[in-house]
Amino acid sequence: MHLRLNPDEPQIMHIDLNSAFATTEQQARPSLRGKPMGVTNRISKYCCIIAASYEAKALGIKVGMRFSEAQLICPEFIILESDPPKYNFVYQKLVKIMKAYSPKVEMKSIDEGIIDFSGTREVNSRSLQEIGYEIKQRLKDEVGCWMKINVGIGPNRFLAKQAAGWHKPNGLDTLDKTNLINYYKGIELTDLSGIALHYQARLNAAGIFTVLEFLKANPDFLHRQVFHSVVGRQWHQRLRGYEVDDTPAKLGQVGRQWVLGKSSRDDSYILPAFQYLCQTTGQKLRFNNVDARGVMVGLHLQSGEYWFKRKMHGSSFYTDQEVYRRALYLINQRPKSEAVIQISITCYELSPSARSQISLLDSTNRAEWLTQAVDEVNDKYGNFVICTANSITGRSLVKQKIPFGSTRYFELLLKEA
């Protein structure tokens, strides 16, 4: 069977600063090197780990695990609160190094990026492997000796990412037509980036149990029988090294969540923080130039229950006041006798903003003009120079979270740091 693998030379390099926040903290604090440690957004009884050092991962401590669970595995586990300016320093250094080799750089997250070498002079005279090793060394020279990155090289974004994860930590590998079949023989379906347990179940139900069987499957079969959408054909191309992932993903929702420092049912503690969450959610809407029609409020209760309410509105909104007004109506319906340990606010059903259109309603115009004026002042002098009194109280309670897995809000976050 002819598999029609992409015959082109690899032109995509994937850079992965794995365990980025934890490694950065170990670089900044030599006493932490070689020790199991992690980073959280705010230290509390219920806080979750957003980054774990290699030493912690080796013990079974994972991202998303609660601090209390990690302590059961390793009583000596060290937890630190996140430090955005520190991570921004490393992020900016990494971006600068990457752009020295090609203008076509795309950061997928704070700790992951892609260099597209197609059409660049650099690749004509030097191998990508040589450039990859040089980038590794430059990061050590320009940031610090403890910094390690994984480098993957491939003909498309997917295979470059797979290659970057092949030999962690500190690996450098290439996947292309010469070694792809042997690589696929040694991995499981869930080792493929994008194939989680639910997709594995679909593949298994269709009689596909190995990556090689996945590779050999007919594209029409994948489309109609397995994924029931064009996603099946995309996987057929992706596995062969053809590019299908160079289109930006559509933004589906924006929001915030907060793990309370202590469980509480007290409105005087909960609502100021909630208003701050709503205000920063409104900022995200405007930052992305979108309006929302739906809003959802979710609460994790001390009893272990999860409570939520959602509402779809006939008209779109984007101002902080409108986000808060709609969300307040929902949170006020919560079971007041139950103590809350975590709050989330989500705006969804997003559409490109129509706020540039002049409204016939004077009150709407006033709200829009006021929001624009406040944003302009805060952009110039720093976030929350102008804000509600409740938000001042709330901001002291809620630490802005590192936008793990995306660079979309990193610039917005640093205005507050």
What are the residue ranges of the model-derived segments?
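Short acidic, glycine/serine/threonine-rich loops at helix termini
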Residues: 24-27, 50-52, 159-167, 246-251
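Hydrophobic alpha-helical hairpins/lids featuring a short glycine-rich hinge
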Residues: 88, 92-149
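Long, highly charged, low-complexity intrinsically disordered interaction regions
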Residues: 127-187, 354
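DNA-contacting surface of Y-family translesion DNA polymerases
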Residues: 5, 14, 201-340
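Acidic, metal-coordinating catalytic segment for phosphate/diphosphate chemistry
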Residues: 315-417
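Short Gly/Ser/Thr- and Asp/Glu-enriched loop/turn motifs at secondary-structure junctions
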Residues: 108-112, 146, 153-157, 290-294, ...
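Residues that scaffold, gate, or flank divalent-cation-dependent active/transport sites
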Residues: 1-110, 114
